[in-house]
């Protein structure tokens, strides 16, 4: 999943 929140990038 691609999620951008609070300036943190999480590519899962």
Swiss-Prot record:
<protein>
    <recommendedName>
        <fullName>Unknown protein 8</fullName>
    </recommendedName>
</protein>
<keyword id="KW-0134">Cell wall</keyword>
<keyword id="KW-0964">Secreted</keyword>
<dbReference type="GO" id="GO:0005576">
    <property type="term" value="C:extracellular region"/>
</dbReference>
């Amino acid at each position: 999943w691609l999620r951008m929140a609070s300036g943190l990038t999480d590519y899962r």
